[in-house]
């Protein structure tokens, strides 16, 4: 080997293998096998080595890999990307298994032939795995051979040509009570006359062991097998090797003839790992079954397949590019035979012969068992019923082979893959490894690795703590190719339940996770009747292939990219977790109906989503409603009492569709179809908006228009006119409420009469007003105290911001006024506490916060008139019955404003010269009366100072008229603010709230006074009818008309 570096097989550490992983692996190896003098140990006690193509990336860094021949164990299971140099054509292989003598030479550690074989010179001619690694393993097992049964530790796959990387796949071995170990060397197919493998002289085994192996091989191997293998070797192409795993004896399964792949097929990698302490130490006996029937734990994650059977943890890895590289080594002769989906060969490789008979070797020998392969068939995994060990075998289903042809698309795809890199070969080492015992060190080591991988796996953290021994997963780096496969297809995890059923966890492409049950899934594959990804003819999906290459065939009714994992043909098994979804939908629907930790506004959110689960929830929710014998409008009112219909238009329509379906189910004879019910339901909703909406453009819809709009929409015919008239009158007389939540009902100003009569007024404060500015809306507190009431005649003198009111809106109107809280309500009828306020009454309401009431000295057309200037600078004139009543209203309004007006924020600062009046808060103050007085006093002092400063800088006479108007407007504002705060301070000093509680007798007397809203015209002064001259009229006009028109 030293002389031919180009042909030597190189084992190196993976670049991303951490130093800690390397040290742990070395320490473990030394613990299991002891230190080897002169060189580091080559073999792994639990995995062997693997030759994999360079484009394969290891996705499991926590398990280590084997290093270069003679350098020891590697701590990472990453597949190395370094390529091996090709070996010359004259390279020699290993003689195939032919009988007791030749079989021992080529497969076992036969001491006689090993000693007789040539040594290092022959090794230089053959590119073989380092024999030193085999020697180290034999030394470690020599003392344990007497125990009776052997265990597979390593299968060396020697191929004639190697163009890809050499990698070692490490498996953990529990050796505290380990009794046996078996070393199997696979057979390279490349020459007819192959010399025996020379082993070092250090290899020594006991004669009894050699004879035992000879006997078993003589009994199990036939001449036909050798002849067929030799025939395959004559193909002139260095075919790939079949890597086999240990199987149970022939008695447990029976002798079944199988057809294997022809030369050129490449074996797969099967890794086995013993469950901690659960594997029966005795192995599998030929005359009796052993172990207990265990549960099958199967995890598939696109590129990786992991199987735990019983006490064994059997892991089958299919890297993404693994099978593609296998295809590239196939010869043209094997194109037909290599078209079987690669995932069918879960643990054993494809055979080197075109028709090998499956031989189940004796368990004491534990030789690799041939796995069947076929060129056109589908395999079904068979569970061992007689044997307690949960070995899983692939058995040819001949009946299904005759029925199911191989699709042409698969032939074309695989042919393209074979022709892509024609002439290339691979070296693949497939370990078939089983352990019968555990030690404390290995148990702890496995537990640490399992928990670490579980923590980063797709399972939730609950899995790590609830069932740490029931799940296993690898930490998988999401490379772009893996991410693409995750997007294109789903992944599933299988767990074997107690009754033989397996829980299928489906992770769909959109992130949804559902749990189902399956009873016919074993090793990730279904039998002939049930198959994974069944689309049309049962065909198993092409696991581990390139992301762009798929063999899945879809049925006509299936959508491309479907994320359904299982389509069970048996009716009793629900696919994709439908049963669990229905149960969850029922539970959620019940909680929504009972409003269990849900608000009324939350219900529509769960019913109106556009997915299958939301539809299930809506269907279950509607089952709580019985609309039998009810009219459509009654059903709608009953339906909307349970929840609030809110959300987007399409979401609300989905809810109405579910309602229509339920109504038609309860009343199939009322309306012709479900579409007719839905159409009429939407028409009722639109009619309600038209008749009772806040914004009405044009006139409201009439009954005749409603009928005309629905002509011909009931399956081509008209609805009954009597039905439409009844619905129209019902909606017109009573508004249909569908978007009112519990809190909104409490805030609504139009409380029901029953609640008012019972005195159950809500304590929340809503806002009234139709302005677009929310700061100018009026706070409405139904529980506020009533300070004064009586008839008042009102005239609007100026609108908001002092703008002159149009002439048509300036007339006098009489109202029954009620000063309740900080709002002056103006009602058309006399005030009744139990009567609800109408919307018109609320529109006429006036807020008195930061307002000032004063006698209208500049208005003499009518007596007893006072002026009310609000915070938004509206000016209202009110006429009372008498001067005393006028003064009472002035005092009450000013007192309420002084006590309850909240301190304003400072005015905004800007560079504009234009004066802007600051907004004043409409909320009620939180200050006490003393603090309120101090606030008003400080504000009065500030306004006085600002007014004096403003008047100290009058505008120049040469400035523009606009600047003069701005100056006068600000002066008028400051003057008004000064007067207002002076009034507030004086009221609070006199008592404030005490003044509000006085004069109750006067308020009571006002209620009993005039019953007619009209005032006596005889009380008007006679001078009102006397015409004045021009000079007199000028004297009564404001001194600054331009300003007065804006502010008064």
Swiss-Prot record:
What biological processes does GO assign it?
Answer: regulation of ARF protein signal transduction
Q: Highest taxon of the source?
A: Eukaryota
Q: Where is this region: Disordered?
A: 36-57, 104-126, 310-342, 364-383, 395-434, 741-769, 999-1048
Domain called SEC7: residue spans: 534-734
Query: Which parts form a coiled-coil structure per UniProt?
Result: 922-952
Q: Which UniProt keywords apply?
A: Cell membrane, Cell projection, Coiled coil, Guanine-nucleotide releasing factor, Membrane, Phosphoprotein, Synapse
What protein am I looking at?
Answer: PH and SEC7 domain-containing protein 3
Source organism of this protein record: Homo sapiens
Tell me the lineage of the source organism.
Eukaryota, Metazoa, Chordata, Craniata, Vertebrata
């Amino acid at each position: 080997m030293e002389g031919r570096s180009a042909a030597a097989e190189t084992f190196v550490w993976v670049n991303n293998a951490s130093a800690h992983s390397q040290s742990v692996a070395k320490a473990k190896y030394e613990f299991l096998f002891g230190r080897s003098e002169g060189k580091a140990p080559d073999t792994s006690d639990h995995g062997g080595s693997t030759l994999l193509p360079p484009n394969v990336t290891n996705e499991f860094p926590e398990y280590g890999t084997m290093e270069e021949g003679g350098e020891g164990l590697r701590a990472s299971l990453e597949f190395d990307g370094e390529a091996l140099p090709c070996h010359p054509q004259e390279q020699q292989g290993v003689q195939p298994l032919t009988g007791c003598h030749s079989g021992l030479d080529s497969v076992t550690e036969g001491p006689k032939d090993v000693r007789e074989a040539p040594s290092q010179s022959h090794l230089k001619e053959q590119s073989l795995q380092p024999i030193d690694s085999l020697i180290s393993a034999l030394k470690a097992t020599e003392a344990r051979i007497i125990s009776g049964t052997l265990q597979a530790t390593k299968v060396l796959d020697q191929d004639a040509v190697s163009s890809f990387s050499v990698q070692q796949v490490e498996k953990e071995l529990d050796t505290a009570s380990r009794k046996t170990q078996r070393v199997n060397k696979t057979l390279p197919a490349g020459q007819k006359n192959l010399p025996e493998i020379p082993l070092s002289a250090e290899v020594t085994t006991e004669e009894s062991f050699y004879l035992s192996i000879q006997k078993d091989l003589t009994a199990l191997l036939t001449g036909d097998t050798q002849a067929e293998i030799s025939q395959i070797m004559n193909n002139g192409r260095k075919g790939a090797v079949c890597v086999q795993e240990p199987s149970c004896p022939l008695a447990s399964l029976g002798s079944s003839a199988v057809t294997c792949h022809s030369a050129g097929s490449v074996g797969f990698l099967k890794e086995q790992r013993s469950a901690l302490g659960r594997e029966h130490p005795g192995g599998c006996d030929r005359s009796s079954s052993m172990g207990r029937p265990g549960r099958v734990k199967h995890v598939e994650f696109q590129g990786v397949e992991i199987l735990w059977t019983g006490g064994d943890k059997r892991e089958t890895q299919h890297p993404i590019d693994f099978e593609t590289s296998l295809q590239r080594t196939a010869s043209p002769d094997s194109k037909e035979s290599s078209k079987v989906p690669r995932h069918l060969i879960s643990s054993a490789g494809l055979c080197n012969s075109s028709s090998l008979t499956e031989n189940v070797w004796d368990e004491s020998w534990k030789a690799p068992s041939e796995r069947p392969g076929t060129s056109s068939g589908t395999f079904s995994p068979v569970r061992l019923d007689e044997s307690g060990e949960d070995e899983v075998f692939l058995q040819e289903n001949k009946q299904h082979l005759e029925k199911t042809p191989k699709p042409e698309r698969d032939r074309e795809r695989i042919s393209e893959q074979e022709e892509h890199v024609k002439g290339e070969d691979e070296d693949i080492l497939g370990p078939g490894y089983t352990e019968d015992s555990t030690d404390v060190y290995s148990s702890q080591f496995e537990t640490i690795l399992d928990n670490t991988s579980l923590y980063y796996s797709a399972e939730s953290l609950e899995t790590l703590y609830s069932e740490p021994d029931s799940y296993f997963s690898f930490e998988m780096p999401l490379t772009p190719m893996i991410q693409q496969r995750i997007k294109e297809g789903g992944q599933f995890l299988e767990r074997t339940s107690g009754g033989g059923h397996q829980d299928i966890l489906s992770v769909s492409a959109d992130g949804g996770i559902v749990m189902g049950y399956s009873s016919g899934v074993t090793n990730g594959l279904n039998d002939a009747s049930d198959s994974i990804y069944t689309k049309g003819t049962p065909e198993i999906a092409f696991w581990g292939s390139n992301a762009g290459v798929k063999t899945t065939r879809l049925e006509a009714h299936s959508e491309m990219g479907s994320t359904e994992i299982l389509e069970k043909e048996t009716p009793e098994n629900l696919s994709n977790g439908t049963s669990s979804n229905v149960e969850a939908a029922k539970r959620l629907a019940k909680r929504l109906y009972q409003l269990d930790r849900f608000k009324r506004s939350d219900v529509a959110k769960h019913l109106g989503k556009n997915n299958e689960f939301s539809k299930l929830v809506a269907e279950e929710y509607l089952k709580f409603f019985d609309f039998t014998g009810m009219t459509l409008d009654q059903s709608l009112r009953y339906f909307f009492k349970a929840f609030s219909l809110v959300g987007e238009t399409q979401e609300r329509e989905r809810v109405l569709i579910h309602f229509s379906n339920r109504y038609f189910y309860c009343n199939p004879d009322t309306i012709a179809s479900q579409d007719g019910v839905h159409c009429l339901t939407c028409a009722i909703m639109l009619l309600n908006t038209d008749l009772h909406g806040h914004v009405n453009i044009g006139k409201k819809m009439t009954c005749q228009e409603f009928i005309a709009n629905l002509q011909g929409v009931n399956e081509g015919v008209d609805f009954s006119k009597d039905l439409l008239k009844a619905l129209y009158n019902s909606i017109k007389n009573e508004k249909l409420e569908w978007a009112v939540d519990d809190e909104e009902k409490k805030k609504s100003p139009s409380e029901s009469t029953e609640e008012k009569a019972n005195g159950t007024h809500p304590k929340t404060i809503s806002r009234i007003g139709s302005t677009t500015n929310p700061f100018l809306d009026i706070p409405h507190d139904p529980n506020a105290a009533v300070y004064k009431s009586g008839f008042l005649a009102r005239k609007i003198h100026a609108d908001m911001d002092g703008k002159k009111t149009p002439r048509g809106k300036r007339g006098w109107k009489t109202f029954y006024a009620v000063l309740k809280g900080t709002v002056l309500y103006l009602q058309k009828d006399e005030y009744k506490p139990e009567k609800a306020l109408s919307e018109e009454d609320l529109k006429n309401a006036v807020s008195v916060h930061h307002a000032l009431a004063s006698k209208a000295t500049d208005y003499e057309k009518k007596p007893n008139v006072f002026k009310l200037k609000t915070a938004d600078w509206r000016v209202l004139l009110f006429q009372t019955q008498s001067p005393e009543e006028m003064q009472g209203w002035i005092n009450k309004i000013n007192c309420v404003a002084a006590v309850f007006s909240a301190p304003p924020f400072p005015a905004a600062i800007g560079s504009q010269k234009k004066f802007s009046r600051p907004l004043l808060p409409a909320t009620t103050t939180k200050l006490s009366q003393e603090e309120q007085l101090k606030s008003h006093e400080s504000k009065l002092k500030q306004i006085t100072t600002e007014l004096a400063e403003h008047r100290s800088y009058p505008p120049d006479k040469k400035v523009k008229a606009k600047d003069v108007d701005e100056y006068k407007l600000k002066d008028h504002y400051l003057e008004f603010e000064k007067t207002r705060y002076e009034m507030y301070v004086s009221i609070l000093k006199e008592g404030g709230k005490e003044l509000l509680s006085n004069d109750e007798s006067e308020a009571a007397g006002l209620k009993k006074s005039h019953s007619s809203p009209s005032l006596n015209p005889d009380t008007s002064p006679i001078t009102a009818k006397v015409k004045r001259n021009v000079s007199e009229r000028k004297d009564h006009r404001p001194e600054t008309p331009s300003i007065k028109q804006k502010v008064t």
